[in-house]
Structure formats: structure tokens, C-alpha cells
């Protein structure tokens, strides 16, 4: 049957990508339907019970700055919070939280059920409705046809998923859920380039059978307790719990080696490539054969369960081997396994077949987000979901798509890497992937993106008001520090020596003093009995006050580095956003090698910047391409997506 209501956007899948996509589309005013095979698993944390980490936390902050749900849901469900790399520079500091799975799902579902313009429906999707070169809807497993002008696919590991435990395997999207076999077959009929990837998860352990007296305790940060959302408060956090640490040993490694003859990875049963930066324990033992021990973190799954997640022993070994290797570790000698670990193989589609908007190049109105694009991780999925949902909404509103640049957001780095370089293994985000990471910090994600999000229709009034107060206070206080001066006469020598190590010998602005190593904002403001502080409180909100002080201090201390990076960005931007015509035949570009013209014709980059990052496309080839465009009068700079792009975002043409 044809469902009587027609929608603007349909989102298929209710994981981290799908929920952010649906919320973003609905926030923009698009009439949105979220189709999921099971409403009870909306926002499910399928693998580890944690959010954030190096690079990943940056993405979560960016999703939050654009009005997304992941950070706020983590603040409401997080049972341990830590700042990683806290002793290092601000560019690589990252927030990580352990989450209560049940509370996290509840927080996400609450937002979905209370979001205007968003409808939920429980049915697996088996088919897409395609007319000519555009998608027009989706068909469920019982034949209900839903019509829409755009569809966002966020199928996770469900596309033709196959679960492996030892040499036993069966179809499934994850343990306990069916695979999307029919939908996978339909996508293959559309001739979209695809491949197989693999990921895995460890066995879960009953905490009542763990001997914690033998383990090392790892508490969260308590002074101060971190928050994830820019609007978050520590008071929102539920009860906090520690994690625990144990280690593998030589006996563990011998047990694993003895089971490799029954490992689906090492017997050729699994063909998909696994994640390099989250390897299985059997892969670790093989790749790092000289290492005598590996650290294993025992992470609580929640406040109302005894289940623990042993982070570091993802495995697809036979269950008897899993049982033996778990029992070989200190503190786990009598541990009871609640769920076996397993590997899962699934289909993904080559992201080079996508525009930077995450719309497929072959089928108008069809967007992909999450693991279907070859990424791994909740955070990478959520960021893509928000972008795909935003652009699906803009597509039906006949507006140009938007995507941040590499110098503007980790989301921009993620998407650019995917659509220009593709993936040979599951892609995860690291700070090392960003050329401009000094400017792309967790702490300034809102300063980089919230104004753009407001223009795009993603940011509500409450977030905008809080951001505006913060932005204005940072600007005022920075200018005050730059324009307030102290001299040897006005600053007592003993105060100067206590703060700076010696008395000053000429006039300095407070900003110049703050720029010195080891000098803090509070230290500068405390000079002259506090007279160097602001005349009026910056804010009466203690959390916002800390954010303002952090922004002011980092902005002043790193001003020179940030300005140099901005100059580099400006130089590189000269050709980065020069658009390439849709119909250009690269075989006609004089001087291009056959290999280069073939790659450019295959991947159809949208800009000179994207073309330059395709493997094998040399700087000389880019120069030839620029000459060709100039001669033909074809090249043009990107336009803008409303006023949002004028704030710095790149745009992608949307075909209607």
C-alpha cells in the first residue's frame, strides 16, 4: 500500500547517524520520517559504551555546536568523564565519557519523540523507490510505500551483515538483530560501487564475577568534572563510576595463538577489512608479536546492570577460546561471560561516489551517512548524519548544499577524506588527520560553527542566546586585556616576580603578560589586588565563565600561531574552492596523463581542492587543469549557501 502521507525526507536507520540526520532535517522544517526496524533500539550503542576520545570528541563538540543531540545525551547519561591529553596543548585535548547505555538511548529517544516535524515508524526497509535518476521513497518489508523527495540511508553494519564466532557464522545486522539483505541487493542493482568491511566486539562480562581487588582503578576527572555539550552542566550527570584495568599476559597470548586455526580472520572465512586502529585481540597478538602484554579496560555498561565491556579484546575466536583467554587475565579468573564476542562483515559503498553533501552522484536525493560510507565509530556516524540530514532538508527546499571546509571543522576533514580518497579500511578520526588542528580545537567548536548553524536553521534560540553571550564576552575581555597596561611604577616588583619570575622593566599590556609561558588568565587578573580583573563580572553563570576564560587565554597565548595558520589557509584557499564543471571531459585537458584523466573522469571531483587530493593527481596536473579552466572560462569560485557560507562554509551544487 501507499502510505497516505507524503514526506520531505525519509531517514532509514535509527543509529547514531540516523538519529542525528532525522533531527537535523526536522529542525530545518522538513517533514521527516525516521524508519527503523525496531523503535526500542533507537540510539543503541552497539559496541563500546563510550563517546569521544582523540579526534572523536572534536566531532561530538562540532555536532553539538550545530545543534545536534550526541553531546547533550552524553551529559545526561555519562557515568565517567575524562579529558584526554590534558597535559598537552589545547589542539589535542579531547573529552571522553563512559555512558550508561539505557540512559543514553532514553535521552536520544526523548529528543526524537519531542522534535517537531519528525515522525517515527517501525518497519525494516527492503527497497528504494527510484524514478529515472532520482529517489522518490522507500518500501518496507511488508510492502508499505512511503514517498519523499529525499532519502538518507544510515544502515550501519546491517547491509548483508554476517556475524562470525569462530568458524560458525549467520546473517545479522548485529547480535540479536536481522540483517538488511534485501536492501543490500537493491543497492547493488543501482550499480553503486561497493565493498565489504569488518568490525568486531568483545565478550561482555558479569561484574559480579570480577575480582576488583586484583585490578587497578581508573576514576574519572573530578576537579572539575568535564561536560560534553556547550550547554551542559555537571549537575546533569548521573552517578559517576570508575573503570578498571587489567592486562593480557604470555599465557593469554599462547591461548590466542592456539586458536588461530579456528579464527575466521586467519582461515580466510572473513574477507572484509577490519579497522586498523581498533584491531581484534588476535590481530594485536599477530601484529605486535614482541609485546608481552596489552592493557585491557573494564568499562561499566551502566548503573542498573552488572555488565562490563572489556575494551581491548574484540575477538571472533571460538567461544571456548574466548572463555579461556578471559580467564587467563588477572581479576577475571572466574569471570562469567554474558555475551560472546563476534566479528561482523557488512557492505559499504565507495564514498568517492558521493558529493561533499553526502548525496550520491548517481541518484539525486539519495544521501548516505555512517558506516555505509566506510567509517567506524559513533562520533563519525553522528557527524555525517547531521550533515546528510541538513543537506537532505536543503535539497527539498531547493537550496544549495553546505559542507564545512577542511580548515573549518573536523567534519570537513572527514567528508573531504571520504569523497576524495575513499577508504581501504574502516575510517576513524584522529587529530593528526587535520592540517589546521590548532584552529580546530574542541574548545572553540561553537565559535567556529554555531553562527553558521544558526544561519542554516539548525541552532535554536536557547543555544543562540548562550553562544551570543559567550562570543561577546570573549571579544570584550580580549580587547580589555590588550588595552589595559601596567608599568614598573604601577605593578609592584614583588607581584611581578611572583607571577613572572622577575620584575617588569617597561610598560606591558595584560595580554602581553598573559602570553608568557606559565602565566594564566586568573594570575593576570589577580595582579594589583585584583584591580587588573574586569570591572564587572563577565557572567553570573560559572560554567559559561570558565568557557569564556578558556577562550580568552587560548586566543591570546596562541595568537601568533593562529594568525600564521590563517595566512596559510588564505594562501591555499586561492584555488581550493574553484569549481569544476559538471560535464568536463578530462581527456580533453591538454597535457594530462592518461592515468590522471582516467581518475578524474572516474571520481568526478567537484572542486580543484578535491582533485588535488586524489591519489596520483600531481601538482603539475592541477596546474594544467587550472590553465584549461582559464582558457575555456570554465572555473568559478564556490557560491554561498545563504549567509551561512559567507561565514566560511563551502557549498555544493544541488541538482533539482
Swiss-Prot record:
Gene3D superfamilies: FAD/NAD(P)-binding domain (3.50.50.60), GidA associated domain, C-terminal subdomain (1.10.150.570), tRNA uridine 5-carboxymethylaminomethyl modification enzyme MnmG/GidA (1.10.10.1800)
Record-linked Pfam families: GIDA (PF01134), GIDA_C_1st (PF21680), SAM_GIDA_C (PF13932)
Region (Disordered): 637-656
GO annotation, cellular component aspect: cytosol
Cofactors: FAD
Gene Ontology biological process terms from the UniProt entry: tRNA methylation; tRNA wobble uridine modification
Keywords recorded for this protein, A-Z: Cytoplasm, FAD, Flavoprotein, NAD, tRNA processing
Chief place where the protein resides: cytoplasm
Signal peptide residues on this chain, from the entry's feature table: none
Binding site for FAD: 13-18
Keyword Transcription regulation annotated: no
Residues annotated for NAD(+) binding in this entry: 274-288
Record localization: Cytoplasm
Comp. bias intervals (Gly residues): 647-656
HAMAP family: MnmG_GidA (MF_00129)
Protein family per UniProt: Belongs to the MnmG family.
Main function: NAD-binding protein involved in the addition of a carboxymethylaminomethyl (cmnm) group at the wobble position (U34) of certain tRNAs, forming tRNA-cmnm(5)s(2)U34.
Summary of subunit composition and partner proteins: Homodimer. Heterotetramer of two MnmE and two MnmG subunits.
Protein name: tRNA uridine 5-carboxymethylaminomethyl modification enzyme MnmG
Organism of origin: Burkholderia cenocepacia (strain ATCC BAA-245 / DSM 16553 / LMG 16656 / NCTC 13227 / J2315 / CF5610)
Primary gene name: mnmG
